[in-house]
Amino acid sequence: MTITQVKIKKLENFSGSLPEYATEHSAGMDLIAANEQPITIKAAAIQLIPTGIAIALPDSFEAQIRPRSGLAVKHGITVANSPGTIDADYRGEIKVILINLGKEDFIIEKGMRIAQMIIAKYERILWEESISLMETMRGSGGFGSTSV
């Protein structure tokens, strides 16, 4: 496994600990809420939650913001634009767009683990326009065509 060093900046509203892997084989690191006051996410509503950190990713890397399964299954709280993408050239505060799909209001307290961040390498492509594409068994079938 390759370890890549990434610069991280604690902002004024930062509190708690830096994102870290919970276990040796964890893919994601928990992001911590850095709100000064509790934030209520009403049922069916969306809120932008600060984390108090900014990062400088190397070229060809992105950060993906994903839901925490416990918040989703227990409270219906998930990341609205999952996965959210943080590009390598973004230097602002990482914020998480949470949506409450539950039936009750949910309160985000300072220091709460609200999402996971996964750092991933990506490839850039160059389009090659073509009048035809190689045939496959699946063809153009989609949206449940391989099974329900």
Curated annotation (Swiss-Prot):
Keywords: Hydrolase, Magnesium, Metal-binding, Nucleotide metabolism. GO terms for molecular function: dUTP diphosphatase activity; magnesium ion binding. InterPro entries: dUTPase, dUTPase-like, dUTPase-like_sf, dUTPase_trimeric. SUPFAM superfamilies: dUTPase-like (SSF51283). Substrate binds at residues 68-70, 81, 85-87, 95. Pathway: Pyrimidine metabolism; dUMP biosynthesis; dUMP from dCTP (dUTP route): step 2/2. Transmembrane segments: none annotated. Its EC number is 3.6.1.23. One of its GO terms (biological process) is dUMP biosynthetic process. It catalyses: dUTP + H2O = dUMP + diphosphate + H(+). It holds the Pfam family dUTPase. Its cofactor is Mg(2+). The keyword Magnesium applies. Belongs to the dUTPase family. HAMAP family: dUTPase_bact. PANTHER family: DEOXYURIDINE 5'-TRIPHOSPHATE NUCLEOTIDOHYDROLASE. This enzyme is involved in nucleotide metabolism: it produces dUMP, the immediate precursor of thymidine nucleotides and it decreases the intracellular concentration of dUTP so that uracil cannot be incorporated into DNA. This is Deoxyuridine 5'-triphosphate nucleotidohydrolase. The gene is dut.
